[in-house]
Amino acid sequence: MMQIWNPWHGCRKYSEGCDHCYMYYLDTQRDRDGSEIYKTKTNFNLPLKKDRQGNYKIQSGTLLHVCMTSDFFLEEADKWREEVWDMIRQRLDVTFWIQTKRAERIAEHLPKDWGDGWENVILCVTTENQKRADERLPILLDIPAKHTAFMCAPILSEIHAEQYLATGQFERVLADGENYDGTRPCRYEWIKSLHDQCEYANVEFDFIGTGNIFIKDGKAYRIPKAYQRVQAQRSGLSYPSRNTDIPMQPKCRFCKRKNSCNGCNWCGKCD
């Protein structure tokens, strides 16, 4: 079971992958400014919230993706992060996926009792091209952690990560194309290369989305957001191979015609 926890919202664009940030796009659709960074009111303490029966709303065994509309190691969030670490410390039965582009800030902002890592935390860095992979992956490899991963999203070039995968420290690699208002293409050969590298190193690889523009055999395919994960899974490029029968995005509850956006708050603007 995978869910999202956004203890704060908003971010500052940091590198090439941020040029067409999905969070900025979705905030624009809601007449909001994605660069406005704030602590969320209702969900800040989500892992500790309980229902009327006294049970945690985030169930034991959940994979909780943290800060998907921000960056966990954002400078502006320094004043809130210790509270979040404390909540993570209290929920050892939940796995927290912590993803960042700011790899150089990780080591100095881990909790004092981090030691050689926490069993319920996966540290993940995003690397959109070879330059960022060569910058960020060595930093993450030098940080003590029980679980590490990296994500190539939006993937903007072929990425050779053989030397990093060969360390045996990475458990999982993910790749996604650029979506929402971005049109920089994702190429089949880039994904196939990552698949082959991960297969050789016996590291899990998940191709999670084609992006808006997917190029294969010299032909560019424009793929609607609702079909991008479906097409990625049907490609057979994940490793190990997995079930390709995945659900489509739900339809907007108002217009019933268009697919709802990720993180939809039913604003009605898809009409």
What are these regions (language model features)?
Residues 2-121, 130-133, 159-163, 167-170, ...:
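Conserved Radical SAM active-site core
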Residues 3-9, 162-271:
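Auxiliary Fe-S-binding modules of radical SAM enzymes
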Residues 64-66, 96-98, 121-125, 148-152, ...:
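Hydrophobic faces of well-ordered beta-strands that scaffold small-molecule active sites
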Residues 69-71, 101-103, 126-130, 153-155, ...:
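Active-site beta-loop-alpha junctions enriched in small/polar residues
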Residues 80-87, 136-139, 190-194:
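A general structural detector for well-ordered alpha-helical segments in enzyme core domains, enriched
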Residues 89-92, 144, 192, 199:
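Anion (oxyanion) recognition and catalysis
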Residues 125-129, 133, 141-172, 177:
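Histidine/lysine/aspartate-rich catalytic loop segments that bind and position anionic ligands
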